[in-house]
């Protein structure tokens, strides 16, 4: 790869070619006296940026918001959305282009769309976002990426007084379901059409082609777009469920039109498994609980379809597209869980086997990640660690006997089966207490824990000697950790 200096990055900003109503050009209002806490060489490679640039003043200036990318525009993009099921109106974000990716500076100050917010992000939430996107990428789940984390001593008032930070995140596009909702709510079909054409041409060109992504009928391109987004969203929900990930704030403005995991706020990877686990303590009704995420994904797609109705005024056709969501999700989820259970395919009778395991884990508070990881050890003949994951070891053993009988029916060698299971059952996930340790170190100016976590989370399925503490159960002190929408 030919590495580029910051000043040489290509800055083809296709979003800025949209009509002026879609954004406002601005100078960010970032925190004072910024310091670079961490930069991500893997993410920099995606845009060809030389990691040697991390040590330059220009890098700090750009990714703190004190200077634009050379030759690029800094834009505040407008969108809207439903938050906790209620229409929230106009929102916005700061972004710019680089190397075919959009870069977004979260915490770089207010925009014309900020409403009552202050445009700031805090260290706590910024460290969590920086780590989470890389953790999800390591797990093989579609996600935005993190490029840089800049900190400042500027005070920011949240539930307590915290310090400011700016995290730069990357994606091919930050267009959201709420981007379409914005123009639909304002009854501006021309802008809605412009946005749909932009998304189709750049990311779903197959929707222009009959027999590829374009569906039959007068509005085949728009229906094809909805079908493609529906499929990606269903697959993403299956990915989340399979690793015990709770997003926490699945508002329509946090739903990517590309099927990426977007906006890491009060998320969590489950420790003790609960079917109705709520990771966001602001979610008093449990709207975004773990077991509700797939249905919320579909609810959000209905909001997107409603926004597209002006362009495809055929309710039955729109509904027919959305009716395909459940089958895609179920097939994908069952496929992922088959791998976690060491099954070559998921048969109808395996649904009871899976449901019984999840109920047993729920009733006995088993650790989601470790229980599945230890199944591989059980297949190798070491059943005790798996059974020790449950209070009632006999019940766990009885369930495992059923799985072993199912394994015997396909004749696969135990070592090959266990190795395949290890490739889909992670050993390391970003547990809240690990993120908290990194936050506390970062508050002292120490990025060492971030380095360790990135090392582990980039290879979450492989045991890495010397880091067993990062794969263990959460310590007692972590029981009181809470995350919320306060970032």
From Swiss-Prot:
Cofactor(s) essential for the protein: Mg(2+); Mn(2+)
Keyword set, alphabetical order: ATP-binding, Magnesium, Manganese, Metal-binding, Nucleotide-binding, Nucleotidyltransferase, Transferase
EC number: 2.7.7.-, 2.7.7.108
UniProt-annotated binding residues for Mg(2+): 254, 263
Annotated InterPro entries: SelO
Enzyme class: transferase
Entry-linked Pfam families: SelO
Binding-site positions, ATP: 92, 95, 106, 118-119, 169, 176, 263
Enzyme active site: 253 (proton acceptor)
Lineage: superkingdom: Bacteria
Catalytic activity: L-seryl-[protein] + ATP = 3-O-(5'-adenylyl)-L-seryl-[protein] + diphosphate; L-threonyl-[protein] + ATP = 3-O-(5'-adenylyl)-L-threonyl-[protein] + diphosphate; L-tyrosyl-[protein] + ATP = O-(5'-adenylyl)-L-tyrosyl-[protein] + diphosphate; L-histidyl-[protein] + UTP = N(tele)-(5'-uridylyl)-L-histidyl-[protein] + diphosphate
A GO MF term: magnesium ion binding
UniProt cross-references to HAMAP family, sorted A to Z: YdiU_SelO
Protein family membership: Belongs to the SELO family.
Role according to the record: Nucleotidyltransferase involved in the post-translational modification of proteins. It can catalyze the addition of adenosine monophosphate (AMP) or uridine monophosphate (UMP) to a protein, resulting in modifications known as AMPylation and UMPylation.
Name of the protein: Protein nucleotidyltransferase YdiU
Lineage: Bacteria, Pseudomonadati, Pseudomonadota, Betaproteobacteria, Burkholderiales
